C-alpha cells in the first residue's frame, strides 16, 4: 500500500477499513506480558521480550520477511503490537494500523486530522491501553510560528485503536517549539509523557529570539486527557530569553510501581543567566572544574526520580558539571565557531537523549545480594547505574566516544543478564574496543554486566565507517540492532557474533518489537545526515517446514 508523501519539512537537529481485532483486552493497568504495547515493552523500559521462544540463536539466520508494508516516508518508531494489530507512525505524518498476520491495512490517519495543523507528525511508538492508542505530536518547522492557541506546541492524543477515531487531545505545552519525542508510558489509569522542543535547532537562526522553552514531565488521565500533574526541569524564566531554558525530556520514562517512582533523564540547557556564565568562567580560570553556579532546580543532564502519583521530585542526580548548548554552537557550525545564539560559554551537548532509563533487577548471587538499579546511557558515551532510592552512583562505564551526535542515543536494552548499548560515534573518533578488540572510528555495540558495569563484549558494526545511534531490542538470546548503513542485524546476545543480516534499504534507528515469533521493524531515517530514507516496515519470521 502506498500513500502520498506530504513534503513535510524535515525537523532541525534536533472511509477506513474496519477489521475485527480478536478477543478483547480486558482491564489493563500496566503493559502485560503479551504483545508489545509501549516502546520499551514494559515499565522497566527493558526493550526485551521474555515470552519469545520461537526465534533463537539457533535459527535467527533463517528469518525472512513474511510481509512488507510501504509507508509514506521514514519509520523511526518501534511498532507496537496487540492481538492481530500492529501500530506505527511515519515521517510523512501518517499513523497506521495493519494486520499482524499479513500486513493488510486496517486503517490510516494523518496526524493533522487530530491536531488541525497540516505540517505535523508523530515520531513516537503508540502506547496501547485497552482500546486506546496514545501518541504525541511534533509540528513541522514551517508551522512553528503560524500555529497558535490550542494548535501550538505539544499535544498528547488518544485514538480509538479499532477505527482511528479521535477520543481526546490535550495540549501539554503551548510553547510553539514544544514537541513529543519520548513515547508515552501508562500505569494505572495515567499516561506519562516527557516534553522536548525544537528550539535548540531554531537557535541556529541568528534572528531567532533564543530561548524560553522549559522541559517537563506530564501525567494525564488516560480516559479523559486531563492533566494530573506537570513537573518542570527548569526554573520559571517568565518567558525571558536571558534566563534558564532547555532541559528537554526526549525519552520515555521507566516506572517502579513498588517504590511509586518514575525515572527519567533530561537534556542540556539552551541558555542560562549571564551571572551563571560569569560564575562558570571564573571557576574555570581558578581551576575549579565543578563550581556550584546553577540554580538547584535547574535540572540539566540529570536523572530524576519523581513521585508517580504527584510528580514531586524525590531525588535528582546531575551527571554533568555544566552544559549550555544550541545548534548555533560547534561542532554543528561551519566553520566551527560559535554564531548567533550560542552561549558565550558552551558545553559538549552531553544530554540524555532518546535512550530512556532501564530499571535493572539484580538477583541474589555470590557476587552480591538482590538489588535494583536505575541504568541510563548518555551522549557522553557513559552508561550510569544509580541507586533507585537516593540516586547515588553505583557504577559508571565509558562504553565509547561521546559527542553532539555521539555516545548513547536512541535506546538501550536489558534481559536481566546483560545491558546492551549502541555507540553512535558520528564524530568518527578512533577508540579501542573492549577486551582486546580492534581500533575503529565508527559505530559499535556492547554488552555490560549489570552488577559491575564491566564490558563483557564489544563488537564493531560490520560496515566500516557507518554510525549506530539506533535503539536495540533483545529476545531469547538474540540482540536486534539496526545500522545507519541500512542493515538490520541479529547478534548473539552472549557474544556479539552476527547471526542475521538484512539490507532494509534505509537507515535503521528504531529497535524492533518481537511478538509470537515475529520481528516487526521499521526502516528509514534521514533527519540527521548521513541518514538514508526509506518507507518500509518489515515483519520477519522463520518459515515453517515445507513452505
Task: Go through each PLM region and give its residues.
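Surface-exposed loop and turn segments in beta-propeller and other repeat-based domains
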Residues: 110-117, 171-175, 227-244, 312-348, ...
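Bacterial N-terminal signal peptides that target proteins for export
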Residues: 1-13
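Beta-propeller domains
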Residues: 55-61, 90-111
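Blade/loop signatures of beta-propeller domains
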Residues: 28-65
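Bacterial N-terminal signal peptides
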Residues: 10-24
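A structural motif specific to WD40 beta-propellers
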Residues: 64-66, 104-108, 165-169, 228-229, ...
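Short loop/turn segments that connect beta-strands within beta-propeller blades
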Residues: 99-102, 160-163, 221-224, 308-310, ...
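Repeat-blade elements of multi-bladed beta-propeller folds
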Residues: 33-41, 72-94, 118-156, 176-209, ...
Amino acid at each position: 500500500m502506498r500513500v502520498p508523501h506530504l513534503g513535510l519539512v524535515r525537523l532541525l537537529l534536533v472511509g477506513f477499513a474496519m477489521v475485527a481485532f480478536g478477543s478483547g483486552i480486558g482491564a489493563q493497568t500496566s503493559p502485560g506480558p503479551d504483545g508489545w504495547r509501549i516502546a520499551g515493552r514494559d515499565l522497566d523500559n527493558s526493550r526485551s521480550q521474555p515470552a519469545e521462544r520461537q526465534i533463537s540463536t539457533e535459527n535467527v539466520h533463517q528469518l525472512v520477511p513474511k510481509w512488507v508494508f510501504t509507508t509514506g516516508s521514514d519509520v523511526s518508531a518501534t511498532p507496537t503490537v496487540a492481538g492481530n494489530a500492529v501500530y506505527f507512525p511515519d515521517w510523512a505524518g501518517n499513523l497506521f494500523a495493519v494486520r499482524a498476520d499479513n500486513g493488510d491495512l486496517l486503517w490510516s490517519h494523518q496526524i493533522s486530522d487530530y491536531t488541525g495543523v497540516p505540517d505535523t507528525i508523530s515520531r513516537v511508538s503508540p502506547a496501547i491501553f485497552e482500546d486506546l492508542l496514545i501518541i504525541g505530536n511534533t509540528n513541522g518547522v514551517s508551522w512553528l510560528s503560524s500555529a497558535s492557541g490550542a494548535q501550538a506546541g505539544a499535544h498528547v492524543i488518544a485514538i480509538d485503536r479499532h477505527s482511528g477515531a479521535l477520543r481526546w487531545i490535550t495540549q501539554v505545552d503551548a510553547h510553539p517549539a514544544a514537541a513529543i519525542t519520548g513515547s508515552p508510558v501508562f500505569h494505572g489509569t495515567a499516561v506519562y509523557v516527557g516534553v522536548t522542543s525544537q528550539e535548540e535547532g531554531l537557535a541556529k537562526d541568528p534572528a531567532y529570539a533564543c530561548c524560553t522553552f522549559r522541559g517537563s514531565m506530564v501525567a494525564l488521565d488516560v480516559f479523559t486527557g486531563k492533566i494530573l500533574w506537570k513537573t518542570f526541569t527548569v526554573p520559571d524564566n517568565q518567558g525571558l530569553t536571558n534566563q534558564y531554558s532547555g532541559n528537554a525530556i526526549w525519552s520515555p520514562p521507566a516506572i517502579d510501581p513498588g517504590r511509586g517512582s518514575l525515572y527519567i533523564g533530561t537534556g542540556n540547557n539552551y541558555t542560562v543567566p549571564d551571572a551563571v556564565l560569569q560564575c562558570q568562567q571564573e571557576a574555570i580560570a581558578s581551576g575549579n572544574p565543578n563550581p556550584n553556579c546553577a540554580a538547584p532546580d535547574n535540572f540539566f543532564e540529570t536523572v530524576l526520580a519523581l513521585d508517580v502519583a504527584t510528580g514531586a521530585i524525590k531525588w535528582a542526580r546531575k551527571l554533568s558539571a555544566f552544559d549550555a548548548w544550541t545548534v548555533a554552537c560547534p561542532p554543528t557550525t561551519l566553520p566551527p565557531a560559535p554564531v548567533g545564539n550560542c552561549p558565550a560559554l558552551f558545553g559538549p551537548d552531553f544530554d540524555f537523549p532518546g535512550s530512556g532509563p532501564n530499571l535493572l533487577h539484580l538477583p541474589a548471587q555470590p557476587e552480591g545480594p538482590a538489588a535494583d538499579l536505575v541504568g541510563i546511557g548518555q551522549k557522553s558515551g557513559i552508561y550510569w547505574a544509580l541507586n533507585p532510592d537516593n540516586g547515588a552512583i553505583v557504577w559508571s562505564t565509558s562504553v565509547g566516544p561521546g559527542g553532539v551526535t555521539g555516545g548513547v542515543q536512541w535506546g538501550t536494552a536489558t534481559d536481566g543478564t546483560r545491558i546492551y548499548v549502541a555507540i553512535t560515534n558520528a564524530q568518527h573518533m578512533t577508540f579501542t574496543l573492549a577486551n582486546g578488540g580492534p581500533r575503529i572510528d565508527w559505530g559499535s555495540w556492547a554488552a555490560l554486566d549489570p552488577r559491575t558495569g564491566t564490558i563483557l563484549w564489544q563488537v564493531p558494526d560490520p560496515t566500516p565507517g557507518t554510525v549506530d545511534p539506533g535503539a536495540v531490542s533483545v529476545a531469547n538470546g538474540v540482540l536486534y540492532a539496526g545500522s545507519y548503513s541500512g542493515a538490520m542485524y541479529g547478534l548473539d546476545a552472549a557474544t556479539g557474533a552476527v547471526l542475521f543480516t538484512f539490507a532494509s534499504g534505509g537507515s535503521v534507528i528504531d529497535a524492533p518489537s518481537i511478538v509470537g515469533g515475529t520481528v516487526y521493524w521499521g526502516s528509514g531515517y534521514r533527519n540527521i545526515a548521513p541518514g538514508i530514507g526509506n518507507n518500509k516496515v518489515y515483519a520477519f519470521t522463520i518459515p515453517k517446514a515445507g513452505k
